[in-house]
């Protein structure tokens, strides 16, 4: 599925969602808020480099990297993508995310780890395009696109994983 915009937004389903959810939702549900993190996310937020020691998270990150088409070379050099930041967001009642973007990164992503269709959408602000949450769905988008998450209005939490992708010389 593609969202109509001037830029490609990749939407897909992670085939190993149940395994990932089973392993990390219990960790994130009891995650303490990180008070010193400067973020547009007005919800519980993990560290910026969270989950690097968890096998199912490593597998997920690798999968996302493989979903992004990249130029093979630029200016004579060959590049590959790497995940620069990776964090979890735990939205509880009345939590939200302010309008923002992820510049200067190349691409960013959101993964709906725990959500229902009626939870707050991911909204691409300038287009008014709403992406309804569904467990297992990922959304990969150019980092410069403005986006936000409206207030979460339910008792049960909504949990997402997010990250930024950038180039490195191979």
Predicted region positions:
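Non-heme Fe(II)/2-oxoglutarate
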Residues: 1-80
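Catalytic core of non-heme Fe(II) oxygenases with the double-stranded beta-helix
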Residues: 76-151, 156-170
């Amino acid at each position: 599925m593609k969202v109509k915009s001037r830029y490609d937004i990749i939407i897909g389903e992670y085939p190993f969602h149940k395994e990932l959810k089973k392993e990390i939702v219990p960790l994130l549900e009891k995650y303490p808020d990180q008070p010193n993190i400067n973020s547009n996310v007005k919800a519980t937020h993990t560290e910026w480099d969270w989950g690097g020691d968890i096998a199912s998270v490593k597998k997920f990150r690798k999968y996302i990297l493989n979903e992004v088409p990249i130029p093979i070379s630029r200016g004579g050099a060959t590049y590959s993508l790497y995940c620069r930041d990776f964090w979890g967001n735990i939205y509880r009642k009345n939590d939200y995310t302010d309008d923002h973007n992820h510049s200067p990164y190349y691409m960013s992503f959101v993964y709906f780890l725990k959500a229902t269709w009626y939870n707050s959408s991911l909204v691409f602000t300038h287009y008014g395009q709403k992406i309804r949450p569904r467990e297992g769905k990922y959304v990969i988008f150019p980092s410069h696109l403005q986006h936000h998450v409206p207030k979460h209005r339910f008792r049960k939490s909504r949990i997402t994983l997010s990250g930024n992708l950038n180039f490195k010389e191979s």
